[in-house]
């Protein structure tokens, strides 16, 4: 259960940096502040310029502070799935003390025992997630503290990632004047937050379509089993439009928003619109079908790469189907195209928070909600990884600033797509622009 207090989530994306301030009262989330700044210094989800990224974080934080009426000191920041690896881990210890009652120290010690392994020098342990404990052979225990036992075992998941990515994220947050309260693995937060209990249990695929990369995650038996990352996203669709139509990037983005559809069969070749072409004195007419074919070509490539990875582990056989989210997923026709390519049920997840009902905010909302609901057992295991004491997540200071109303929030840096009505097809699509787990569901 979420603690009562204030929690702040930070999502450092390719196209924008988003900050959400959420207040929890009796485990109910109330979003009281949002910041959304255009990203700089980030390419394909990777930080390439620390100073520019710091500035973008500071802009987003200032917006959130003004709207929430608080001073933000610490954040839970998302860690992307780039080269993320997940493996099972197990630790076992003898219970300390004459009474043999299991304490916080025993939980920390058994987590430390589970970390004993060889890690390549370029990688580091990011997080350990306890799944259950065994006390003297009694299995399935979620919190062993207060129980009596001689032998304590812990079974969990261990997440490792590249030192460079982890360091750069921490460096940017700290240089922005903030404390990293929690480093949250974004695909884990997504699958835990947006899926129902049944979807987590029976198995579901989540595809997060961002501006610079697309992340595929599989949850089964209530565990994150698999992640895959393709460094292509919605920004690449815009670049394709810009190149094919010989127009500026900004014009291409506007065309995608106003006329774009990822499913050509829904569009018409008779519907035309003007395009400002570089080198032409007058706008050139382009039909809706042609634009849709340019968009669908890139989207098909993204989905086919995801399908290839999912086919290797037979994940498409899971009954939960696919849940799409992220800004690029909200483009009209994406759900129809995905359903055609994957051959399973596909749906779009949209956050239900007032003023933030757009998939571009799914990640940051998931980050803050996931961190707010972390258990005490997790926090104890976390100390084994960081070697630090747990930092309070809701350290904020009240300021005399304008209060924030969710209903009036406007996100000028983000694209909001409205799904149009179904359109009739009049021709087929023509020429287009050219893990480590296996059999995990046995």
Swiss-Prot record:
The keyword Chloroplast does not apply. It comes from the Bacteria. It is found in: Cell membrane. InterPro entries: ATPase_NBD, Cell_div_FtsA, FtsA/MreB, FtsA_C, SHS2_FtsA. It is a peripheral membrane protein. The keyword Ion transport does not apply. Residues 407-419 have a biased composition (Acidic residues). Residues 401-428 are annotated as: Disordered. GO terms for biological process: FtsZ-dependent cytokinesis. GO terms for cellular component: cell division site; cytoplasmic side of plasma membrane. Keywords: Cell cycle, Cell division, Cell membrane, Membrane. Self-interacts. Interacts with FtsZ. PANTHER family: CELL DIVISION PROTEIN FTSA, CELL DIVISION PROTEIN FTSA-RELATED. Belongs to the FtsA/MreB family. This is Cell division protein FtsA.
